[in-house]
Amino acid sequence: MGRSTKKGPYVDPKLLKKIRQLNEAGEKKIIKTWSRASMIVPEMVGHTIAVYNGLKHIPVYITENMVGHRLGEFSFTRRFGGHADKSASKGQVKK
């Protein structure tokens, strides 16, 4: 079940405060955040936010298409090593 519409989207208050300060000053700095659950709002468009993935901060440039999604969706926490080669399994003999 999703969040109630009367509450509005969750955005970390400190992150939103930093975004608003940068918008007033007209600056474009990278903002570090650990708040992966924060919703991307239109005020964030054009900023680069470094989202923590458990190991390091991944820079994410916010575009209009991302509005309504969560910051954590763009900073993967797991590394995909790839599927096994089919050629490696062909040489095995079934018993």
Curated annotation (Swiss-Prot):
InterPro entries given in the database record: Ribosomal_uS19, Ribosomal_uS19_bac-type, Ribosomal_uS19_SF
Keyword Magnesium: no
Pfam families named in the record: Ribosomal_S19
Record GO biological process: ribosomal small subunit assembly; translation
Membership in a protein family: Belongs to the universal ribosomal protein uS19 family.
GO molecular function, one term: rRNA binding
Source organism of this protein record: Thermosipho africanus (strain TCF52B)
Gene Ontology cellular component terms for the protein in this record: cytoplasm; small ribosomal subunit
Keyword list, A-Z: Ribonucleoprotein, Ribosomal protein, RNA-binding, rRNA-binding
Protein name: Small ribosomal subunit protein uS19
Function field: Protein S19 forms a complex with S13 that binds strongly to the 16S ribosomal RNA.
